[in-house]
Amino acid sequence: MSPFASESAWLCLAAAAVLGGTLLCGCRSGRQLRSQAVCLAGLWGGACLLSLSLLCTLFLLSVACFLLLYMSSSDQDLLPVDQKAVLVTGADSGFGHGLAKHLDKLGFTVFAGVLDKEGPGAEELRKHCSERLSVLQMDVTKPEQIKDAHSKVTEKIQDKGLWAVVNNAGVFHLPIDGELIPMSIYRKCMAVNFFGTVEVTKAFLPLLRKSKGRLVNVSSMGGTVPLQMTSAYAATKAALTMFSTIIRQELDKWGVKVVTIKPGGFKTNITGSQDIWDKMEKEILDHFSKDIQENYGQDYVHTQKLIIPTLKERSNPDITPVLRDIQHAISARNPSSFYYPGRMAYLWVCLAAYCPTSLLDYVIKKGFYPQPTPRALRTVH
């Protein structure tokens, strides 16, 4: 091999290492990589395969490094807080509760929409946050409460404007086969996770158009990665993701930026309490047909309920990555369209997009939690 070829090979390896490292960091951190960076990695690989000249190789490496540095620096360009007003739904607990506190500490004017204005979550916000934070009664499935919240927000902000709306309110269900989930649970999930978000968005968009602000919708990795036993929840998050993607294109002409957050597994109250699990189990069993009873059995449902503590144990109790990404989506001059906070969340999304279906199904089946066997499929000894 000639010295020239050797030098070109080492340069290609160095560039591949830089770009590959960038992609890996994006997978580990959950931050979406700009599409240009992904394309850049592919183009670089193609250029290396074409055995370009040493001069051209050096030029492309310089351009690649410049673009990566430029994209990285532009992500860090944050707008001043200036007491910007932000509405957060689902602030009773979990992401919404933590975000309301976090934004209040940063100096934002926060409107915390809660399901129960007299509940412990709302009381804690009133107790520990500044006077800039207002707690609003806001069940996103009740149009009259959304309308009332809109009136109160408009009255308080007056000419200052509303900078951002964070649609975070959401519900989960007992993890179980889609065949066993009653239609009432499907409807409830859709009412809160999708229609609630759409209704809040439609109500507050006139204010966001005036401020040329931000619409941040909290979806889920489950809306992209097909996880078993989550059909009702995942379907609503998939619908929310598509709604957010399309409305992002539509609102671009108004200067409103729309961002979708797709968290991985975090420990929040969305899975509910023991009482809620028991009620869901009873509701599922009450809708059992004779065929379902014979093929699945009641113990199958009970075993599925026992999986929930395992899910919580495997979830990350530190929601800081989610809060950090939402803050960035609100404050960055050029936010990403998607954020994937969580352990290897972006990697799972990539697997769902590019992995062969049979292999993806196998990985999901083996990689999350043990599946009980329905009564009719159990081996009789």
UniProtKB/Swiss-Prot annotation:
Tell me what topology the record assigns in the membrane. Answer: Single-pass type II membrane protein
| E.C. no | 1.1.1.62, 1.1.1.239
One GO term of the cellular component aspect?
endoplasmic reticulum membrane
Organism's domain of life? Answer: Eukaryota
Reaction catalyzed: 17beta-estradiol + NAD(+) = estrone + NADH + H(+); testosterone + NAD(+) = androst-4-ene-3,17-dione + NADH + H(+); 17beta-hydroxy-5alpha-androstan-3-one + NAD(+) = 5alpha-androstan-3,17-dione + NADH + H(+); (20S)-hydroxypregn-4-en-3-one + NAD(+) = progesterone + NADH + H(+)
Give any Pfam family that matches. adh_short
The protein, known as: Estradiol 17-beta-dehydrogenase 2
InterPro entries named in the record: NAD(P)-bd_dom_sf (IPR036291), Sc_DH/Rdtase_CS (IPR020904), SDR_fam (IPR002347)
**What broad class describes the main subcellular location of this protein?**
endoplasmic reticulum
Alphabetical keyword list: Endoplasmic reticulum, Lipid biosynthesis, Lipid metabolism, Membrane, NAD, Oxidoreductase, Signal-anchor, Steroid biosynthesis, Transmembrane, Transmembrane helix
Entry binding sites for NAD(+): 83-112
Which molecular-function annotations from GO does this UniProt entry contain? estradiol 17-beta-dehydrogenase [NAD(P)+] activity; testosterone dehydrogenase (NAD+) activity
Question: Transmembrane stretches, by residue range?
Answer: 4-24
- Give me the residues that bind substrate, please: S220
Q: Which lineage?
A: Eukaryota, Metazoa, Chordata, Craniata, Vertebrata
